[in-house]
Amino acid sequence: MILFNNVNKVWPNGKQVLKNITLEINKGELVAVIGLSGAGKTTLLKTINKINDISSGEIIIDFDKTKDHYEITKTRGKKLQKLRQKIGLMSQEYNNIANKTVLQNVLNARVSSQKGINKIIGFFKREDKLIALNSLNKLNLLDYAYIRADNLSGGQQQRVALARTLAQQPFLIIADEPVSALDPILANQVMKDFKNINKKDGITVIINIHHVDLAKKYATRVIGLNNGEIVFDDVPSKLDAQAMKKIYGE
């Protein structure tokens, strides 16, 4: 569960990008956040793992399986590091190492679980390799395991990035415009991957997305932002012309 209670964010130049954000996101939801560029979508996501600090209000995260409780404004040091290990973060950039194989790229998600010399030299235990291979298998990417990342298409590279995120074994995935650089067919495939992970693994997923049609097709809930405020929060079927006008204006 993620609780935003009257959250505000003001940049040093005085521009307020989040205004009185109050919402609750429950375990197992697939939430699409939509709105114009500059509406506050990316800032909202980056407050969850404290990449962006908030100016006022509170954000509380509870992970049911581990019973870990985080008050974000008070979370720092090792506890913040522990929180970030539980949250998979994706963006429109693939962040793959071009001259490494797909498997090597996915294994990078396991670096934080290594200790001592193993962490320095990049030696991974059998257990970590099985986790990485299982993540590739979930996305039907096993056949690409020993192919270099720079030999893949953009859609395949984004799916490798998703496999790497899965290998992190997160409780929550937040994705910032993960399909913005993809053509419609590949964008649908990646969104379908998110949907399958959400349903089969029970991982909560929050996605910033410009494609309203994809938000309506794959999300269980849509949040619309306009000028830093929540102006829509409902199931996709309620996203009618009136709601779109609130989110995007005339």
Curated annotation (Swiss-Prot):
Q: Which residue ranges does the record assign to the ABC transporter domain?
A: 2-247
Give the location in the cell.
Cell membrane
Q: State its Enzyme Commission number(s).
A: 7.3.2.2
**Which family is this protein grouped under?**
Belongs to the ABC transporter superfamily. Phosphonates importer (TC 3.A.1.9.1) family.
Q: Name one GO molecular function term.
A: ATP hydrolysis activity
Q: What name does the UniProt record give this protein?
A: Phosphonates import ATP-binding protein PhnC
Q: Record's NCBIfam families?
A: ABC_phnC
Extract the Pfam families matched here. Answer: ABC_tran (PF00005)
Say which enzyme class the record assigns.
Answer: translocase
Q: Where does ATP bind?
A: 35-42
What does it catalyze? phosphonate(out) + ATP + H2O = phosphonate(in) + ADP + phosphate + H(+)
User: Keywords of this protein's UniProt record, alphabetized?
Assistant: ATP-binding, Cell membrane, Membrane, Nucleotide-binding, Phosphonate transport, Translocase, Transport
Q: What does this protein do?
A: Part of the ABC transporter complex PhnCDE involved in phosphonates import. Responsible for energy coupling to the transport system.
